[in-house]
């Protein structure tokens, strides 16, 4: 059965930015601060390293009853029995991913336009990651998405939307009244010296919108 997901504060990992010794430590601190969902994103490591990292991170997420999503790698997601997988526009098509993972896993898709959003929803996405909303150092090649486009996406799809890309605690208020379901955060949590406090502050800002 597909898990019920709270998308509100969604940490996307980046080992190059983390302020802690280990990724597991960063993830646990973020969860203690209020992160409700974790995505393990590893772009520059071997399959074995990714798998081993996923096993260790899943021990932390399982301990706190927080779902783990794997970025891009359907095989890793299935191997560690993660809650689901997240794919981008240049990854395996969402419809194929859905066939592989079945109906009991969560499928997230990165989108930046209404057309991409509608296509993702049609192909079985459970949620959309919309952005990049602002310029970001973590994905320098990411196309930007306007607030107007975000509103159009919200009006045209019924599945949950999380926004991503350059979001920090001071920008959360920009999304007031749009109807987003969560914030996908990288550096504004994982790069902070005090990860737990950073997550708490973002959660407090999200509650206001």
UniProtKB/Swiss-Prot annotation:
Residues the record lists as binding Mg(2+): 72, 91
Catalyzed reactions: 2-[(2R,5Z)-2-carboxy-4-methylthiazol-5(2H)-ylidene]ethyl phosphate + 4-amino-2-methyl-5-(diphosphooxymethyl)pyrimidine + 2 H(+) = thiamine phosphate + CO2 + diphosphate; 2-(2-carboxy-4-methylthiazol-5-yl)ethyl phosphate + 4-amino-2-methyl-5-(diphosphooxymethyl)pyrimidine + 2 H(+) = thiamine phosphate + CO2 + diphosphate; 4-methyl-5-(2-phosphooxyethyl)-thiazole + 4-amino-2-methyl-5-(diphosphooxymethyl)pyrimidine + H(+) = thiamine phosphate + diphosphate
GO biological process terms, semicolon-separated: thiamine biosynthetic process; thiamine diphosphate biosynthetic process
Cofactor: binding comment: Binds 1 Mg(2+) ion per subunit.
The entry's keywords: Magnesium, Metal-binding, Thiamine biosynthesis, Transferase
Binding-site list for 2-[(2R,5Z)-2-carboxy-4-methylthiazol-5(2H)-ylidene]ethyl phosphate: 136-138, 166, 186-187
Required co-factors: Mg(2+)
Pathways per UniProt: Cofactor biosynthesis; thiamine diphosphate biosynthesis; thiamine phosphate from 4-amino-2-methyl-5-diphosphomethylpyrimidine and 4-methyl-5-(2-phosphoethyl)-thiazole: step 1/1
Function in brief: Condenses 4-methyl-5-(beta-hydroxyethyl)thiazole monophosphate (THZ-P) and 2-methyl-4-amino-5-hydroxymethyl pyrimidine pyrophosphate (HMP-PP) to form thiamine monophosphate (TMP).
Protein name: Thiamine-phosphate synthase
Organism: Clostridium beijerinckii (strain ATCC 51743 / NCIMB 8052) (Clostridium acetobutylicum)
Gene: thiE
């Amino acid at each position: 059965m597909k898990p019920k997901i709270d998308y509100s504060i969604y940490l996307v990992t980046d080992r190059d930015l983390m302020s802690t010794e280990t990724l597991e430590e960063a993830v646990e601190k973020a969860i203690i601060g209020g992160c409700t969902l974790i995505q393990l994103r590893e772009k520059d490591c071997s399959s074995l390293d990714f798998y081993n990292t996923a096993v260790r991170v899943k021990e932390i997420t399982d301990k706190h009853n927080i779902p783990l999503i794997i970025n891009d790698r359907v095989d890793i997601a299935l191997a560690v029995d993660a809650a689901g997988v997240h794919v981008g526009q240049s990854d395996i098509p969402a419809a194929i991913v859905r066939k592989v993972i079945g109906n009991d896993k969560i499928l997230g898709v990165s989108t930046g336009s209404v057309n991409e959003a509608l296509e993702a929803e049609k192909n079985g996405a459970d949620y959309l990651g919309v952005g990049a909303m602002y310029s970001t150092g973590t994905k320098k090649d990411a196309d930007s998405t306007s607030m107007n486009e975000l509103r159009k996406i919200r009006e045209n799809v019924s599945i949950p939307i999380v926004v991503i890309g350059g979001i920090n605690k001071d920008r959360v208020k920009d999304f007031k009244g749009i109807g987003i379901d969560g914030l996908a955060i990288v550096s504004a949590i994982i790069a902070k010296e005090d990860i737990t406090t950073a997550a708490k502050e973002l959660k407090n800002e999200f509650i206001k919108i």
